[in-house]
Regions:
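Accessory alpha-helical/coil subdomains and C-terminal extensions
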Residues: 99, 110-112, 120-130, 137, ...
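Short glycine/serine/threonine-rich phosphate/pyrophosphate-binding segments
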Residues: 15-25, 49-50, 91-94, 114-122, ...
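Short, ordered loop/turn segments at secondary-structure junctions
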Residues: 11-13, 42-47, 80-81, 113-114, ...
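Glycine-rich oxoanion-binding loops at beta->alpha junctions
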Residues: 52-106, 115-116, 143, 168
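Short glycine-rich or small-residue beta-strand-to-loop segments that form or flank ligand, phosphate
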Residues: 5-15, 74-80, 106-112, 184-189, ...
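C-terminal non-catalytic interaction/assembly regions of soluble proteins
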Residues: 256-419
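N-terminal phosphate-binding or glycine-rich loops at protein starts, especially the Walker A/P-loop
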Residues: 2-54
């Protein structure tokens, strides 16, 4: 019987290290040629499987694949497309089986966040409910760091490092200008429901470099009066302050401060624009001159300042996914297990997808200071190891050198499928 081929795809928002996971998958699979045949990638996530838009990664050299480890974003294209349940849309699952059969695919690796875990779980059920043998392994990825069970999520450590460094540097800038100009700097970061990225801004200030920073978490209902009082207190004491605000901050009425009524493909509120809202509160309530910025894609694409810890974990979980599949596992996700804080040690674990899909991990209350505007030492102990270590990409003429794969299409064998 012919060796089964593997399918790998990327889903949801991309990160600085998702390609490191792809590198881990492809290199590990190539090392098991006795058990795995071809390694296909789906162009634009699960859509690539449904549309039979497959990429033959075998057309790329070992050197090119290795370069994925230091290349940001999604090498094969990503998507925001959520499979409906089997009962709701059986035709999508029949199509997946049709494509898998046509290309002899027996291994399914899906690299993404919570919604992607849900998609992977649904694909894993093809085996039991529809009789097609498939082993579906989810590879965690999300800058939001909100997947359960795993200690942290690949992608988070690097965005956390970017935010911590940026807040420290911007705070130095504001301090320089505060006497006659800007006194408050507001930066908006990602995080719809969980404040992990915003919390990373707290790392900018430590015992060797104390800085006046206010953090606004999604987990803490926003109180305008308390916020303005805290900003005013810090400006009067230090002459300036920096504010790190999560895009998902809600008022005490439960509504997003930045909700414009839009929704993304997963049905989530399309957020953004909370920084100017908060900055205007400072101007109107306190009269201080301000500047605001939105980190947006910059925070998750910044491979030049990636955390080595994050890169290593991303690669390790991609590698582990293949190893789990070869052991016969299905509907599972490799995880990061923290062994110790000092020294920081971790290992790879495994979690059932049923306990991961559609579950969000919020910031524990004891990670946030009593006033709701900062991080505790417990939080600092959790976050600090995740941003450690440098893993710079190669540079040429002052610019990082990233790889673009050939992404050669696999010839189609089936009729077109309308999504």
């Amino acid at each position: 019987m012919a060796k089964k081929n593997a399918f790998y795809a990327q889903s949801g928002g991309v990160t600085a290290v998702i390609n490191a996971s792809a590198c881990g998958v492809i290199e590990t699979a190539r090392g098991h040629k006795d058990k795995i045949g071809k390694i296909y990638a789906g162009r634009n996530g699960i859509i690539g499987a449904l549309a039979e838009d497959l990429i033959d990664t075998g057309k790329d050299s070992a050197k090119a694949v290795a370069a994925l480890r230091h290349t940001p974003s999604g090498a094969f294209g990503s998507c925001r497309f959520k499979l409906k349940g089997l009962e709701e849309n059986r035709v999508q699952y029949e199509r997946l089986i049709e494509v898998f059969k046509a290309h002899n695919i027996g291994y399914f690796f899906y690299n993404g966040g919570g919604d992607s875990a849900d998609t992977c779980l649904k694909v894993s059920q093809i085996s039991g409910k529809m009789g097609y043998p498939i082993q579906a392994i989810h590879i965690p990825k999300t800058v939001d760091n909100d997947l359960p069970i795993t200690d942290c999520c690949p992608g988070f450590g690097s965005v956390a490092k970017y935010i911590a460094v940026s807040v420290r540097e911007a705070s130095f800038d504001v301090a320089s200008m505060a006497k006659t100009s800007t006194k408050v700097f507001v930066v908006e970061v990602m995080g719809r429901h969980a404040g992990w990225i915003a919390a990373a801004g707290g790392l900018a200030s430590d015992k060797n470099c104390e800085l006046p920073i206010v953090i606004l978490f999604p987990e803490i209902p926003f109180n305008k009066e308390k916020f303005l009082a805290r900003v005013d207190e810090l400006v009067k004491k230090h002459g300036y302050c920096s504010v790190v605000v999560s895009e998902g901050v809600k008022g005490e009425d439960g509504k997003f401060l930045s909700d414009q009524g839009l929704r993304d493909a997963f049905g989530h509120a399309q957020l953004g624009g909370v920084a100017p809202v908060v900055a205007n509160m400072v101007r109107e309530g306190l009269g201080y001159k301000f500047h605001w910025a939105v980190a947006d894609y910059l925070q998750r694409a910044a491979r030049h300042i990636a955390s080595k810890t994050d890169v290593d974990q991303a690669y390790a979980l991609g590698k582990a996914a293949v190893e789990l599949a070869l052991k016969g596992q299905n509907a599972v996700m490799p995880t990061v297990v923290r062994v110790s804080d000092k020294p920081y040690k971790w290992k790879v674990g495994v979690a059932p997808l049923g306990k991961v899909a559609n579950v969000e991990k919020m910031m524990p209350r004891d990670f946030i200071t009593k006033d709701g505007f900062g991080i505790t030492e417990k939080c600092r102990a959790y976050l600090a190891p995740l941003i450690k270590g440098e893993d710079y990409p190669p540079y040429k003429d002052g610019l990082p050198q990233y790889v673009r794969l050939k992404n050669v299409a696999v010839p189609k064998k089936l009729v077109e499928f309308k999504l």
